[in-house]
C-alpha cells in the first residue's frame, strides 16, 4: 500500500519509520524544501491548498492521512473526492477547533469544565463574570507547547488578554485544579473495532511534555477507554 501524508515533518517521519518495515510506501505533501520525512518517501513540495498537487497525490496513493490537525479542512474535503482519507473531514473539523472539541465532549456526557466562546474583549469580560477566576483562555485553533493560552488568575490579567492572544477566536475555560495529567492512545479501524494502549502519566516542564510513564491504574484505564470510545465513535473516526 502507498500512503499519502499531508505534512512531512517529524510526525510524518515517525509514521513512515513505523510503516516502512511493514511494507508500506509513503508520499508526503509539504511546502518545506527540507521536510524531514522526505528521505522516507516521495516528497511533493506544494502548499496544502494547491489543488493540482493534491490531485497528483491522490492519483499516486491508495489512502491519505495527515500528520497534524492544523491541515485546512478544505484540503481533506478536496482529497476525499478522489481517494479515501482517514481520519475523515468531520474528525479534523472537530480536532482542530477547541470550541468544537469541548462542545462534543459536552454532548457525549464527558465531564467538561464550563467554557465560553470568545470573539472580543467584551465577550471575555462577560464570560469571566459568569465562569469566574481563575480561568484559562486559549485560542480556538493552533497553539501547542504552552503557546496560544493564558491563565487568568486576577482581574488585571483579564485586561487586554484578547489582544495579547492575537485578537483571534478563543475559548475561556473554568480552571480545573488537578494533581496530574494522563493520556490514552487509541486506534479505531474502518469496521469500528477499537483498541487501547495503556494510560500514561505525563510530566510537563514550561508547558512542554518532558516525560510519559505507563500507568497501572485499571479503574482509571476503564474510565478513559469509555470516554475515548465515545469520542472515536461520534465522528466515525478511523
Residue ranges and their predicted role:
Residues 1-100, 122:
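ATP-binding N-terminal substructure of ATP-dependent carboxylate-amine bond-forming enzymes
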Residues 94-183, 187-234:
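Active-site nucleotide/adenylate-binding loops and adjacent lid/helix of ATP-dependent enzymes
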Residues 236-238:
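Short, intrinsically disordered, charge-balanced linker/junction segments flanking boundaries
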